Amino acid sequence: MYSLPGATMSAAPARVISSSSSSSFVEPLLLAAASSAAANSHHQVRQRGHLVRTLAASSSSNTLLRSDFDLQEGLTTDVKRMLRQRQKKSGGGREMLVTIDNLKRLCIDHFFEEEIEGAMATGACTRLLHSDDLFDATLAFRLLREAGHDVSAKEDVLRRFIDGVSGDFKLSLNNDVRGLLGLHDMSHLDVGGEEAALLHRAKEFSSSHLASAVRYQDNPSLAEYVRQSLDHPYHLSLTQYKARHHLRYLQSLPSSCRDAAVERLAVAEFQLNKSLHQREMREIKRWWMDLGLAEEIPVVRDQVMKWYMWSMAALQGSSFSRYRVYVVDDIFDLVGTLEELSAFTEAVKMWDTAAADSLPSCMRSCYKALHTVTNEIAEIAHKEHGSNPINRLRKAWVVLFDGFMVEARWLATDQVPTAEDYLRNGVVTSGVPLTFLHIFSMLGYDDPSTEEEEEAIIDHMPSIISCPAKILRLWDDMGSAEDEAQEGFDGSYRDFYLMENPSRSPGEAEAHMRGLIAREWVELNRECFCRRTFPSDIAQVCLNTARMVSVMYSYNKEQRLLVLEDYAAMMLVL
């Protein structure tokens, strides 16, 4: 299931599944946030559009204690004072960069953007990049690359730590746990090119020696921190999830190595965000019950918390709270014949509620909700940012349903697509492009000035959108989505790849798919850190979405999502 903020959204699986050619299950329609869709005559609920306007008008902080925000503001002032003193004392050297890294890892760096930018501009970070200390050099590299600076992993850092005779990493690094952690973090910021092979070696070297360090480490807190870093690499993991573990590690250090004000601010931020998420969750559950679709359509899956987790992960921070609420989406199975699905698609193209009158009851309700929610989101974007994205959003819906129809026709005609064709279409039917377009509109991303530019983002999908979509589709298709409980043939990339390569085993197919996922991460890194075509908040949404995928689809042997359970407990449970 897929749920994201700022827009309506479609299911990750979003594929045609059936055991006969005359009918199909399609996981499409995302119904977002407090929709004002007309309820069926037998459902007596309040006008759902009112909830959207109520939430938009009210501040998310109203239900939180003023004293909590006063505490947060006071702690922020304390940390800013400390940063200025540290900058003046060290000129932005190692101590300052370690503090910046801690602020980022604790998800409180947004309070100190000006101070961080000032420290990065001093040149101290560049000087540290050329240090002979592995920890210093890898930390400086990561901070510079994340900020979009042009740095070379090979020339600026790694060549100094490679033995000139053997060509391997120096043996003296084997016991440098902090340096190895930095090397491991750095290795995941691969943007391809000449550095790719060396960063891959750095990843293997650091992983191997860190695994040994865990076994022989006499410091339990450090051992757990290393284990967490290996299981959940910093760049590939949700920063909110990693933040709690990082704080726990910082709190285990000697008092002389700790920043008390930073830790207190992190705790205050965690508590405020948890209260905010709990409030949002209550509103979402209320909206879902009012919508009544779980009763109206028997196959609808009622997993509101899981859907909300997508929204919470992609748009992090209290400033995005309104958009998370607008976007609470659902993915539900829509049962229908090929002809009915075609009629539904045509109704979407017409974008007129009257066009849905001939549809079956459940489809009609879904269509009207979809129509109303999308128009509401367009109105919100228009009011806040001055341009109305409705034409772009309408076309995005048409593209999505055209993709669904491609899959429906494959099934109805017993056509077996190539793995490549399936994946190309699966990027669209993942729902990620549609959702991102809604998010871009909600966040006020520059409205294209011409119709040609407006259509380009849909017809010629940029990698910042296609990469998370492919990552999601491939993860889901590796067979880990056991909770979908779907019957019939479940066409997937792995199925079609094995049909094309009968000599390959399922394990080899999975290894191939993991390789494709790694390749998409490299391309996503290149877009976010090198090209930087999109604003940083848009890039962060796309990175967070890609990071959330493994959380949603990594099942253990008992078919439980342990990381998701842990993350939900951290962010939502009292």
Curated annotation (Swiss-Prot):
Transit peptide as recorded in UniProt = 1-55
What enzyme class is recorded for this protein?
lyase
Residues the entry annotates as binding Mg(2+) 3: 476, 480, 484
Q: Which family does it belong to?
A: Belongs to the terpene synthase family.
Instruction: Kindly state what the record says about how the cofactor is bound.
Output: Binds 3 Mg(2+) ions per subunit.
Stored PANTHER family: OS04G0344100 PROTEIN-RELATED, S-(+)-LINALOOL SYNTHASE, CHLOROPLASTIC
**Taxonomic path:** Eukaryota, Viridiplantae, Streptophyta, Embryophyta, Tracheophyta
Keywords for the protein's UniProt record, in alphabetical order: Chloroplast, Lyase, Magnesium, Manganese, Metal-binding, Plastid, Transit peptide
Q: Among its keywords, does the record have Transmembrane?
A: no
- Any one biological process term the GO annotation gives: regulation of defense response
Q: Which residues bind Mg(2+) 2?
A: 329, 333
Pathway the protein takes part in: Secondary metabolite biosynthesis; terpenoid biosynthesis
Summarize subunit and interaction data from the UniProt record for this chain. Monomer.
The record describes the protein's role as: Probable terpene synthase.
Q: Name one GO cellular component term.
A: chloroplast
Location of the protein in the cell: Plastid, Chloroplast
Q: InterPro entries, from UniProt?
A: Isoprenoid_synthase_dom_sf (IPR008949), Terpene_synth_N (IPR001906), Terpene_synth_N_sf (IPR036965), Terpene_synthase-like (IPR050148), Terpene_synthase_metal-bd (IPR005630), Terpenoid_cyclase/PrenylTrfase (IPR008930)
Q: Cite the EC number.
A: 4.2.3.-
Could you tell me what induces this protein? By a musk indanone elicitor that mimics herbivory. By corn leaf aphid feeding.
Gene Ontology MF term list: magnesium ion binding; terpene synthase activity
Question: Protein name, please?
Answer: Probable terpene synthase 3, chloroplastic
